[in-house]
Amino acid sequence: MGKAKFERTKPHVNIGTIGHVDHGKTTLTAAISKVLADKYPSATNVQRDFASIDSAPEERQRGITINISHVEYETPKRHYAHVDAPGHADYIKNMITGAAQMDGAILVVAATDGPMAQTREHVLLAKQVGVPYLLVALNKSDMVDDEEILELVELEVRELLSSQDFDGDNAPVVQVSGLKALEGDEKWVEQIVKLMEAVDESIPEPVRDKDKPFLMPVEDVFTITGRGTVVTGRAERGTLAINSDVEIVGIRPTVKTTVTGIEMFHKQLDEAWAGENCGLLLRGTKREDVERGQVIVKPGSVTPHTKFEGTAYILSKEEGGRHNPFYGNYRPQFYFRTTDVTGVITLPEGAEMVMPGDTTDMKVELIQPIAMEEGLGFAIREGGRTVGAGTVTKIVK
C-alpha cells in the first residue's frame, strides 16, 4: 500500500491520557501510536515507542517548566494531537496552566487496582479546568481473569465520573492491554482499535478557534501620522473583517470603535484570522485611549471582571518559586494574556496558608477589571517573577 496523502480536511481534535502514575498511560499512548501506524499507514501515523514518549521534553508555560510529550496520529475520521504528561506533578501543572488544552481525555485505570487517589484527583481537576469529555481505558485487563472483578472496577469508575458531573452512565469503558497490544497480540490490538473508535464517536468535535467570536489581546499601540491609532497583537480566536465594529475591553470602561484597516507584515488585508499577528487601525481612537492588556473583541462577546475563583499551582522553591508560604490577603500580580494586574487572594475556608509546591483553590479580587471568561489561564507573579499559574474556574463579578 502506498503512503496515504496527509489530508487537512479531517477534523482536528486535541486529546490526552490522564490517570494514576503507574496505570500505564504512556504504554497505552505508545500502543495507540503503533496500532494506528500498522492499521492505517500514513505520513502522520508513525509509531512512537515508549521510551520516546516517556522521556518527555521540558516545556515552559507561563514561567513553569513541565515535562510533556506530544504524539500525533490519525484515524479514518479524525486527526489527533495527543498529550501525555508522564509524572503526576507534570500532569497537574499541565492541566492548571493550560499548556495543552484538551477537547477530551482518555482516563486510564488499571483493572488490577481500580481507581486510586490520583485517579480521583485527575478527574476532579479535569472537571475544574473544563475538559469537556472523558472516556475510560481499563488497562492491564489481560491480568484479570475474573469477569466479575472487571465489572466491579467498571462500576467504580463510572461512579467516580458521575460524582464529578461527567457522563458516568454512558461513557465508553473499553478493556485494553497496552503492553499486549505493543507485543502484537491480535485480541488486544483489536481492543485498541475499539478504544479509538469510541474516541472518534464519543468526544464531541470542538468548535475551532476561527469559528469563535473574534478576540485579540493588545500587545502594542502606535500612532500612524495621518491615519490614526494602530493596535498590534496575535488574534487568539475568530476572524475579523475590515470595517467591522469592535469593543476595547478591560482595565478601563469598554469603548466601541470600528476597524478601518488590517495589516500583516506591512501588507493590507481584508480580514484577520485566529493565530495571525496583525495590526488593526482603529477609527477615531487616540493613542492614549488604548493600552497593552486590553483586548479587541467582537461586541458583546466578552465582559470585564474583577472577582473570580480559580485553581492554581504554586511553584516550589526548586522551580524558582517562593521560599516560604503565603497566607490569606496575599497581594501578588495576576498576569492575564499580556499584562499584570494586582489582586488580593482569599484562601478556601480552613486553609491557613499555601506552601510552595501546593495546588490550591482561591478567590481573587483584582484592582482593575480584565476581560475574562471561565477557563482563562493566568500566571501569579511577584516583581516580574512567576510564582504560580492557574485557571479561572468561576467568574463572581
Curated annotation (Swiss-Prot):
Keywords of this entry: Cytoplasm, Elongation factor, GTP-binding, Hydrolase, Magnesium, Metal-binding, Nucleotide-binding, Protein biosynthesis
Residues where GTP binds: 19-26, 84-88, 139-142
Coiled-coil boundaries: none
Location of the region described as G1 in the Swiss-Prot/TrEMBL record: 19-26
CDD domains the UniProt entry points to: EF_Tu (cd01884), EFTU_II (cd03697), EFTU_III (cd03707)
Annotated region described as G4, given as residue ranges: 139-142
UniProt catalytic activity: GTP + H2O = GDP + phosphate + H(+)
Domain of life where this protein originates: Bacteria
Domain tr-type G: 10-207
Keyword NAD appears in the UniProt entry: no
Pfam families reported in the protein's UniProt record: GTP_EFTU (PF00009), GTP_EFTU_D2 (PF03144), GTP_EFTU_D3 (PF03143)
Region (G3): 84-87
Segments of this protein annotated with the region G5: 177-179
Keyword S-adenosyl-L-methionine assigned: no
EC number(s) reported in the record: 3.6.5.3
Protein localization: Cytoplasm
SUPFAM superfamilies: EF-Tu/eEF-1alpha/eIF2-gamma C-terminal domain, P-loop containing nucleoside triphosphate hydrolases, Translation proteins
Ligand binding (Mg(2+)): T26
Start and end residues of each stretch annotated as G2: 63-67
Molecular function GO labels: GTP binding; GTPase activity; translation elongation factor activity
Top EC group: hydrolase
GO cellular component, one term: cytosol
Subunit structure: Monomer.
Similarity comment: Belongs to the TRAFAC class translation factor GTPase superfamily. Classic translation factor GTPase family. EF-Tu/EF-1A subfamily.
Job description of the protein: GTP hydrolase that promotes the GTP-dependent binding of aminoacyl-tRNA to the A-site of ribosomes during protein biosynthesis.
Protein name per Swiss-Prot or TrEMBL: Elongation factor Tu
Organism: Clavibacter sepedonicus (Clavibacter michiganensis subsp. sepedonicus)
Lineage: Bacteria, Bacillati, Actinomycetota, Actinomycetes, Micrococcales
